[in-house]
Amino acid sequence: MNWKTATALSTLYDYAVQNRALSRLGARILWNYDIANLHRAISTQDPTALTLDIPCGGGMAVRGPRHVAADLSATMLHRALRKTNTLVQTNIYALPFHPATFDACVTYNGLHCLDAPAAAIAELTRVLRPGGTLSGTTLVRGTNRDPLITAFQRLGIFGTPGTTEDLRTWLTAAGLRDIELTPTGAVTAFTARK
């Protein structure tokens, strides 16, 4: 599956995520996760911080004019245009930004779709200013939802998700500190500081 060209899947995914009732039901049934946790995390973002949101999807996490929405998928960026006009189509492994550009980077529900999540975390850390925060959520292995994760991998929708401990290792290896991990169901929320 190539998220860059999967127009129908991208549109369907964004519709479900943006619909409160569908996202609540889907998150609970599929991942044993209360989507309200994600909405709370998004609501705590500082709208005055220069923030990179990647993959931004349809822009659900956009929180102000200093928010740069980035995604590999042109379909997702088109949908995010409803919330911001600061859009960048890019690959998460080679961000077109100078080192130490952003006060914060957020990556909600995207790392598990990647083949090299550790490399993505390292690249996000590169563009963070000293003292900046990286936060997000990702599906993780090591729960009773592993068979479903494997099925999504076989369909090419997911890349190589790790466990919560793998996530800690990736964040630490990228040079991040003050790491906080909050596993709930098959989702782990995380925050770390550069």
Predicted regions and their residues:
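Core SAM-dependent methyltransferase catalytic element
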Residues: 179-194
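Class I SAM-dependent methyltransferase SAM/SAH-binding core
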Residues: 50-94
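A short glycine-rich, Lys/Arg-flanked "PGG" loop and its adjoining helix->strand segment in the class I
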Residues: 118-130
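Conserved class I S-adenosyl-L-methionine
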Residues: 1-46, 60-61, 76-79, 135-158
